[in-house]
Amino acid sequence: MATGYNWVPEKYLESKSKHKYGDILQKSDSFKHDLGNSFRKRRHDDDYGKVGKPQSQPTRPIQRSKRIKTPKIIGQALPVSRVVEVLDHRSLQQLLTKLLTIHPEVATTINKLSPRPELKDCLETLRERFDEIINHLPYKCDVESDYSYLRVKPHLNEFLSCLSDLTLSFLPPIEVNTLQSLTFLDYVTSLIHQLPNFANTEFQYTKVQAYDQLANTWIIAFNHSLNDEDCQEVASTKDAKVESLSKIVKMIEDNDLINKLEKHNDLSQGKFRMVIELVKATVDNYESLSESLRAKSLLGDMFTVDYSNFVAAQSLN
């Protein structure tokens, strides 16, 4: 058998080829028909399902809220002016104390700018320091014992320190109002009387020193009223010192100053004797000057009598 020889007739091959191709087309058409029927059936089933089931309403799409842009805000410390405004008295006092400790050069500026403390406020502050001493005394112990003294010693030192500072601020030339100075000194001296009489020798020495210094400040304050430049000017222009002394004597009498000093002198065992002598001498000086002024006035009236009528009557006789 020769290679490549075709044993089947060509007609047979053509008919067979056509037959195969026709079968393929027939099968293809049959597949398309079945596929179409299947698709239509499935679509029919879907449509039937859609008719039988209630259609749910489409949900409303959720709108995304737009983010509002806000300015960036961060916390910050209070301004110094607000800090001073909202702080209580104790906190403000501690703040100033720390400031003066860190910057002592600020003290001069504060003294220049701060207003003059009122007498009432100064006395209240001093009273608070005194109350600290009394409040820290032991309950189940002798008040005058060494134990009691040692327990309140820090508060006693604070009281005496405050007393010293305030006393100096009420002396001339810082305080030129004599009545203000004497009112303060009278209150301070009364507080010294009220201190517990501790038997401790250190306290007894401190108390004696306090009385001596207070007596000296009484003399300084009272002498300022006598040596005041305004009073000296009035006395020189009117040639009557009694005019200036009259105001001082009136202050002494209105405030019952001599009786107060005598009480202080009794409680301090004679420490205010010189103060009493000075005040009494001022009153005596005023009275003597007033008497001499009245006598001079009467003598002047005698020399100013008009004798013209008497002389005329004598000439007629």
UniProtKB/Swiss-Prot annotation:
Gene3D superfamilies: Tethering factor for nuclear proteasome Cut8/Sts1 (1.20.58.1590). GO terms for biological process: nuclear protein quality control by the ubiquitin-proteasome system; proteasome localization; protein transport. Keywords: Cytoplasm, Nucleus, Protein transport, Transport. One of its GO terms (cellular component) is nuclear membrane. Residues 34-65 are annotated as: Disordered. InterPro entries: Cut8/Sts1_fam, Cut8/Sts1_sf. It is found in: Cytoplasm; Nucleus. It holds the Pfam family Cut8. Coiled coil: none annotated. GO terms for molecular function: proteasome binding. Binds the proteasome. Belongs to the cut8/STS1 family. Involved in ubiquitin-mediated protein degradation. Regulatory factor in the ubiquitin/proteasome pathway that controls the turnover of proteasome substrates. Targets proteasomes to the nucleus and facilitates the degradation of nuclear proteins. This is Tethering factor for nuclear proteasome STS1. It comes from Meyerozyma guilliermondii (strain ATCC 6260 / CBS 566 / DSM 6381 / JCM 1539 / NBRC 10279 / NRRL Y-324) (Yeast). The lineage of its organism: Eukaryota, Fungi, Dikarya, Ascomycota, Saccharomycotina.
